[in-house]
Curated annotation (Swiss-Prot):
Belongs to the acyl carrier protein (ACP) family. Pfam families: PP-binding. This is Acyl carrier protein. It comes from Trichlorobacter lovleyi (strain ATCC BAA-1151 / DSM 17278 / SZ). GO terms for molecular function: acyl binding; acyl carrier activity; phosphopantetheine binding. The lineage of its organism: Bacteria, Pseudomonadati, Thermodesulfobacteriota, Desulfuromonadia, Geobacterales. It is found in: Cytoplasm.
Length: 77
């Protein structure tokens, strides 16, 4: 697992209050990890802060799974 993937999974687990083992690549924030729309906004903000990037709203809406987040961060850092 890459350093980015590990850090993303740690942030997801912390922000959504789930076990890191649940943050598998294909897990959907809303369907599998129980996030609501506010949780996903806070998650995006935490990712922006951790990786020092800005995620535009139109991109944030496309980040729906753990792998989506990992891919986005990898492409934009």
């Amino acid at each position: 697992m890459s350093d980015v993937a590990k850090r993303v999974k740690e942030i997801i687990a912390e922000q959504l209050g789930v076990d890191e083992a649940q943050a598998v690549s294909e897990a959907s924030f809303m369907d599998d990890l129980g996030a609501d729309s506010l949780d996903t906004v806070e998650l995006v903000m935490a990712l922006e802060e951790e990786f020092d990037i800005e995620i535009p709203d139109e991109d944030a809406e496309k980040i729906q799974t753990v792998q989506d987040a990992i891919d986005y961060i990898t492409e934009h850092t």
